[in-house]
């Protein structure tokens, strides 16, 4: 949806909300679409009158994206325009307003509204707060691209070394993605204020400043079931299976890493389990046959996962002579795992991941 379309829709939504308030009526409306406010650095100016005949002007700035960076830009402009004039009230409007953007607006005395009619306004005794309307315009396009396979390689690097400052070139090399892909990831991270830039020109570096927010957003957009699963059965107990698998794969120099219950048992011993999970960078059936595991459709106790992207193996760690995924990957996998996985993920977060922040 382009800006003129958003302006038209926001104008209609605000008009409907105000007219149904029983307290305000609209006197006059001007918008950038009609060129009448083109010099005023706003998109819509709406004059309203209270039932006590007092008039105010609502200055509405529209952005096509509602991430915190754009909210701050709009808020800064609206504060400048409404400074020392109590007859003016600024409103930030966009397709969807994130929770952080809402907080930014409220903290600065600025209203907000989205295309579903969720809104917040407070001026001269008038208060309106509408939440919970289903927003069909809530796009996951930006987040989808931020949490896509190639992009998440950069996120793993940042989260595994959260205190380091990076040049785009260095992060791209470490994450094994192109310079262009890394630049796009950086731009999106800036939009959501997950990172902070320092320096000037070519010396400009950036570092993670909201690791928990980024990790939580990623976990909401990730499910371990995105990987390909191969289930097998062995008569051995899980501990013996894990030792046998680890010894064999190391002898063959095949990359692997335990995760889920098997990974948690070595980093966050929180779960009792009867099933082995591991990522494998080889043919699962070939390895299983060599180990004497039987392929099954139900009742398996060994699950070999082929990773959706090789970035899964970034930051793998050796514990008790066994390779497991990074704490970040283990947290992501556990978060939506049904057998008390979320509890194990939080245990891992509190006892291992946070200590690096």
State what each model feature region is:
Residues 1-33:
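Acidic-basic catalytic patches of nuclease active cores, encompassing PD-(D/E)XK
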Residues 28-44, 291, 296-357:
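C-terminal regulatory/effector modules of DNA-binding transcriptional regulators
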Residues 128-153:
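Short alpha-helical segments that sit at the start of domains
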Residues 109-121:
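Charged, structured surface patches that assemble and position nucleic-acid processing machinery
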Residues 154-217:
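Loop-centered beta-sheet repeat module
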Residues 38-83, 91, 331:
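Conserved catalytic cores of phosphodiester-cleaving nucleases, focusing on short active-site segments
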Residues 83-109:
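Nucleic-acid nuclease catalytic cores
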Residues 225-308:
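Short gly/ser-rich loop at a beta-strand->alpha-helix junction or flexible surface loop bordering the NTP-binding
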């Amino acid at each position: 949806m382009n800006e003129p379309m958003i302006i038209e829709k926001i104008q209609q939504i605000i008009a409907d909300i105000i007219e149904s308030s029983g307290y305000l009526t609209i006197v006059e409306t001007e918008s950038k679409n009609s060129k009448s406010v083109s010099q005023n650095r706003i998109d819509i100016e709406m004059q309203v009158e209270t039932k006590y005949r007092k008039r105010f002007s609502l200055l509405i700035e529209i952005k096509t994206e509602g991430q915190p960076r754009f909210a701050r830009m709009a808020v800064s402009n609206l504060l400048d325009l409404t400074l020392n004039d109590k007859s003016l009230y600024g409103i930030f409007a966009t397709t969807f307003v994130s929770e952080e953007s809402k907080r930014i607006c409220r903290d600065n005395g600025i209203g907000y509204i989205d295309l579903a009619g969720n809104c917040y306004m407070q001026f001269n005794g008038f208060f309106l707060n509408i939440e919970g309307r289903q927003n069909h315009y809530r796009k996951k396009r930006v987040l989808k691209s931020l949490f896509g396979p190639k992009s998440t390689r950069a996120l793993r690097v940042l989260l595994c070394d959260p205190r380091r400052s990076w040049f785009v070139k260095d992060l791209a090399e470490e994450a094994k993605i192109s310079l262009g892909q890394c630049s796009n990831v950086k731009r999106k991270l800036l939009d959501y204020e997950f990172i902070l830039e320092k320096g000037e020109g070519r010396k400009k570096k950036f570092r993670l400043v909201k690791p928990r927010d980024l990790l939580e957003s990623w976990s909401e957009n990730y499910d371990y079931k995105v990987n390909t699963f191969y289930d097998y059965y062995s008569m051995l107990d899980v501990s013996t299976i894990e030792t046998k698998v680890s010894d064999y794969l190391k002898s063959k120099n095949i990359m692997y890493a335990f995760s889920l219950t098997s990974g948690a048992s070595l980093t966050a011993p929180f779960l009792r389990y009867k099933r082995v999970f591991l990522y494998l960078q080889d043919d699962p059936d070939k390895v299983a046959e060599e180990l004497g595991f039987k392929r099954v459709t139900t009742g398996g106790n060994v699950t070999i996962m082929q990773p959706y992207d090789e970035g899964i193996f970034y930051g793998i760690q050796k514990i008790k002579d066994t390779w497991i995924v990074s704490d970040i990957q283990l947290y992501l996998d556990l978060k939506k795992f049904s057998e008390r996985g979320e509890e194990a993920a939080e245990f891992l977060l509190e006892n291992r991941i946070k200590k690096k922040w």
